[in-house]
Amino acid sequence: MCDDLLEAAEVRNGEWTHRKCKTKLKPVGDNVCYHCGRPVRREKQEYCHDCTRGIQQKQSPYWKGTPFSCYQQGKALFLYQDEAKKMMYRFKYGNRRTYADFFADEAQKQYGDWITGKSVEAVVPVPMYRKKEKQRGYNQADVFAKKLADALGLAYEPAAVQRIVDTKPQKELG
């Protein structure tokens, strides 16, 4: 990616990126884990290795009595590799708040019907620990959640969940 998203006023035909750059973002495809949304190898495979292991171990640090975390199903916009990985890094750590417009627009295009079909009442951002948010300057999940809620006409509830413990970053959870 050239790291040059178009401004909202310049967006043409719903495209926030240059055509050449957009081809660098690889779609996830149809064969994904039913729980987390990661690609799976076989067409009939329902769960990825990690989610299968979670079911087998019947352990959950999040929700007692279930092998899964407290969310029902995850979705991904692009494969988390190459350009998408770099773009996410810039969004999180490079103060590229305008990326939220692009990600929210893509989420609405790819999953808007799925989200509204689930009778979702509100979009709730994943909170950051205050110290981490202060260091980073903002919570990218909060910015994205607001844009997505606006795009889908849903309530936005930033105070619905609070992070009171400074946990390890998701990338360190395995």
Cite the ranges covered by each PLM segment.
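Glycine-rich phosphate/pyrophosphate-handling loop used in enzymes and phosphotransfer proteins
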Residues: 1-174
